Amino acid sequence: SNADAGVALVLARPQGAATGTRGLSLFLLPARLPDGRANRYRIVRLKDKLGTRAMPSGEIILEGATAYMVGDPERGFVQMADMINMSRLSNGMRAAGLMRRALTEALFIARGRDAFGQPLIHLPLMRRQLLKIMLAAESARTITFRTALELAQADAGDSAARLRVRLLTPLLKFRACRDARRAAGDAMEVRGGAGYIEEWSDARVLRDAHLGSIWE
């Protein structure tokens, strides 16, 4: 992901290292070398993705590229696992944000769009649908803030908080990312057929929402 980034973190096995995950080390791969020359790797292709199109994902080929080891040798997999855990947290936060955007759009439309001689937001079934989106968005935001608090306490040396973070992070990622897919679809319906048009944000939010439960 983010194939055109200035730096990338990659796992590689140094010569003579052990087999399996224990022999992997973490390396920093810059796009350009200190003298300004491009590093020796090529982006072979960019992937035609359903969503998150603003962040290009691609395949690269290393051609004698220069990279710098990060941390202790042969602990790359452990370091990458820590990064993946943080990425799971960010996925949950991202899902919470997507639902908040979907809810904001849905409420705006429900207040301004009329049906049966009155605004949509006055109709009981529409209120029920909006409430479902709101509950999912609020629960995701609440657990996101709680997990962030526990993470700050864990970084300060609280061992009990560290254990809670290990539990909360996958729960947030699983629940929020699943809820975001449903919430994005329900919010699109509030705008009607216009929500299916790329001129509005609903289509992009819906596409992006489906990635969270797949990543990490």
Give a label for each model feature.
Residues 1, 17-19, 34-37, 68-69, ...:
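Flexible loop/turn segments at secondary-structure boundaries
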Residues 1, 18, 49-56:
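Short Gly/Pro-enriched turn/cap motifs at secondary-structure boundaries
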Residues 1-40:
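A short core secondary-structure module
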Residues 2-10, 23, 76, 95-96, ...:
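Composition- and surface-driven signal marking solvent-exposed, interaction-prone regions
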Residues 4-7, 21-24, 38, 55-59, ...:
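Active-site lining segments that contact anionic ligands and/or coordinate catalytic metals
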Residues 13-17, 48-49, 67, 211:
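Short beta-turn/strand-loop junction motif enriched in small, turn-promoting residues
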Residues 32-40, 44, 49, 56-87, ...:
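A glycine-rich, basic-preceded beta-loop-alpha segment at the flavin cofactor/substrate interface
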Residues 61, 88-216:
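Alpha-helical interface subdomain recognition
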